[in-house]
Amino acid sequence: CIDSSEGFSEWQKLTIEWVREHYGDTVKIGAGNVVDADGFRFLADCGADFIKVGIGGGSICITRETKGIGRGQATATIEVAKARDEYYERTGVYVPICSDGGIVHDYHMTLALAMGSDFIMLGRYFSRFDESPTNKVVINGQYMKEYWGEGSARARNWQRYDLGGDKKLSFEEGVDSYVPYAGPLKDNVAM
């Protein structure tokens, strides 16, 4: 997935073109994130196989505060789902959308699907379980799991990213936090 808080961008277009040029349709491309119909149409026309929806709605995301961009997750999902359906009517190509952000409670999944999302990003939800790669810690007598987002300084310090350019122009878009520990995944998620 070509993951960015600014998915409606020339960078995403060039990246999708590069992947298509080198790998054709053998690689499925997810792109995003976007929050409106124009962003969806742009990425769909660029050739994305699925599109992520949401800027600033994640539980540990601070993009709205640091960059001044974003939109409510429900509003974004509804508008992009409508654009997806119109795109399908016009082209015959169905481009699924992924609601990315704002899932804290179980019922939020139902809401995201009811608003038109085809599938859901569940970072915070799954970070609570034994299977997540983070440490289990005790805070004020309660077991918690560490949790941080890809836009946080902690994730960037792993040096997985070649951000290029001037480091002073880089924005931190996420924070570190904790979520209540929930035990093993198999005891909590029906399969």
Residue ranges and their predicted role:
Residues G24-T26, C46, G68-S99, V104-M191:
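Alpha/beta catalytic cores of nucleotide-metabolism and tRNA/nucleoside-modifying enzymes
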Residues C1-I16, V27, G32, D36-E79, ...:
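Glycine/Thr-rich beta-alpha phosphate-binding loop at enzyme active sites
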